[in-house]
Structures are given as structure tokens and as C-alpha cells.
Design a protein with these regions (language model features):
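Membrane-inserting effector segments that mediate pore formation, membrane fusion
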Residues: 1, 59-98
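C-terminal low-complexity, largely alpha-helical membrane/lipid-association modules
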Residues: 1-69
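Membrane-engaging insertion elements
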Residues: 2-3, 89-129
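Glycine-/small-residue-rich active-site loops that bind phosphorylated ligands and cofactors
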Residues: 26, 225, 259
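Acidic-basic catalytic patches of nuclease active cores, encompassing PD-(D/E)XK
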Residues: 119-206
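Conserved catalytic cores of phosphodiester-cleaving nucleases, focusing on short active-site segments
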Residues: 177-246, 251-253
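Domain-level recognition of nuclease-like catalytic cores that cleave nucleotide substrates
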Residues: 254-277
Length: 277
């Protein structure tokens, strides 16, 4: 059987298993090739093609239909999209991991991505019931799922990666799904660029890293961290974290933005080492 035919029937199998979410195009649009054109435009504009942003989806569909109907390539029909700035929150272009996955997200249909992600989750030892719940979670677009899964899959040898997927199920909205995605990316970045993480450890609803030199690494993709009740509870949990049989010499906090003076003061008072942007 030719590869294209095999891929087609494999994709149909994914379609019949769980259906598509609200942020995904219909099967008809996928099979006639429109969705592939739309993904090209989204990739060119640097936005999430599966975003729930209605303004973005409307404008993106308009541009993609024009290009699809006229057979015009992305390079020949560039035009601004209203709402793209609103969707920029969901598009992270600066991370090395995301850059390396752009072609995967561009070329693969949602069913293809779901297959790839399922295989990687199985390899990580995630139970089938958890895999199903994660891959059909309404808060996660195929982009969120794919980047998160690939970030963890690339951290080969790190223990408890399957626990991260379980924690990620706590997400109720797209913003929270994006938060878990970015946390996975940041842990991956620390693991590959700073020093290797030995295992992932649960702390409340999140996961932190534990290195071979006995350092706890917590990552927070936040622009500005205020001192509020959640900050108080989270920092207290990190400061008091007790890993049976595994001593903790230092606890590091990595944020993509910065802390308010009050938050920095409180974190430092608890012995937490903060790394700001």
C-alpha cells in the first residue's frame, strides 16, 4: 500500500476514535486540503491555528479561503490579520523547542499529531486512560498537546514524566493549558541548557524538577508575579518540600518575567533563589 494511502486510512481511524474539538476544522475541510492551507498561513503569521480566539479564527479562515480558492501560496497572499496580537499570547516563537517543531505543526493534521503524541506518551509509560483523557481534553489545542508532549519526550531518562501529564489534566481553560505547556518547555530548557533534571516531583497542582546536585527547579511562565495568597501557598510548599531519602540543598525559581519587590522579598526570606528575565 502506498505511504499516502496508508497515512490517509490511519488518519481516518483517528477521526473515528474521538472526533474533533471546537478549535479544529471539520473533516471535510481537512480532506479537501483547506486545513493544510490554513496551517500554512497560521505558521507564517506565528499564531496558533487551533486557538479558541474567535476573531483570529474568523480572519484566518477568510485569508485561508481566499488563498485556497485561488490556489495562491502563502508567500503571495500575505496580509495583516485582525486579532493576531490578541492571539500572540498563545504563540511562543522564542523557544528553541517550538522552533524545531514548526514543521511538524505545519505539515501534520490534528489526527496525525494525536497519533504521534499517543505513541510518545506510551513510550513515557503513561496509562491508556490518562492518554485518552489528555488527548481529548477540551482545554488543549493540538498545538498545546504536541509541544507539551514533545518537551517531556525529549527529556529522556527523567523519572515521573507521566505524572506531569496527570497534573496537566487540571487545566480548565486554554490559558491554563498554555501554562502547563510553557512549564514543560521551561523544564525542558533547563534540562538541556542549564543542567540535567533527574526526576519530576509534584508540588500542589504543578511539577518541579529535581537535579542530581540536589536542586529543586520550579518554572513559572508569568510576566509579573505578585505576592498574593497563591504565591504565599506555592512558595511555602516549595520551601517546605520534603523528598524522602533525597536531600534538597537549594530551591530555584525561574520566571519568564519578574517579581514585584514584595514577592521577591518574601521568596528570598524563605530561602528561594529567584531567576528573573
Amino acid at each position: 500500500m502506498p505511504k499516502g494511502i496508508g497515512k490517509f486510512f490511519s488518519r481516518i481511524g483517528e477521526m473515528t476514535k474521538g472526533g474533533r474539538g471546537d478549535s479544529e476544522d471539520s473533516y471535510t475541510k481537512e480532506l479537501i486540503g483547506f486545513s493544510a492551507t490554513k496551517r500554512q498561513y497560521a505558521n507564517k503569521f506565528g499564531v496558533d491555528v487551533y486557538s479558541s480566539n474567535e476573531v483570529l479564527q474568523k480572519e484566518l479562515n477568510s485569508v485561508a479561503w481566499a488563498g485556497f480558492a485561488g490556489g495562491v501560496g502563502v508567500k503571495l497572499a500575505m496580509m495583516p490579520i485582525k486579532g493576531a496580537s490578541e492571539a500572540a499570547y498563545y504563540s511562543i516563537q522564542a523557544t528553541k523547542l517550538t522552533h524545531g517543531m514548526n514543521m511538524i505543526l505545519l505539515d501534520k493534521a490534528p489526527e496525525d499529531l494525536r497519533q504521534i503524541n499517543r505513541e510518545k506518551l506510551i513510550q513515557m509509560g503513561v496509562k491508556e486512560s490518562v492518554i485518552y483523557e489528555f488527548l481529548h481534553h477540551p482545554a488543549y489545542s493540538p498545538r498545546h498537546e504536541t509541544i507539551l508532549v514533545h518537551a517531556l519526550a525529549d527529556m529522556q531518562g527523567v523519572k515521573n514524566r507521566e505524572q506531569f501529564i496527570k497534573k496537566a489534566l487540571y487545566a480548565e481553560y486554554e490559558e491554563e493549558a498554555f501554562l502547563y505547556q510553557r512549564m514543560a518547555e521551561m523544564l525542558h530548557g533547563y534540562h538541556t541548557q542549564v543542567k540535567p533534571i533527574k526526576e519530576l516531583v509534584p508540588v500542589r497542582k504543578f511539577m518541579v524538577g529535581y537535579t542530581s546536585d540536589q536542586t529543586i527547579v520550579a518554572t513559572f511562565p508569568i510576566d509579573l508575579l505578585y505576592w498574593i495568597e497563591l504565591s504565599d501557598l506555592g512558595s511555602a510548599a516549595l520551601a517546605k518540600l520534603d523528598l524522602t531519602g533525597r536531600p534538597v540543598k537549594k530551591t530555584e525559581i525561574w520566571v519568564t518575567g519578574s517579581l514585584t519587590p514584595r514577592a521577591m522579598q518574601e521568596f528570598n526570606a524563605r530561602g528561594l533563589v529567584v531567576n528573573e528575565r
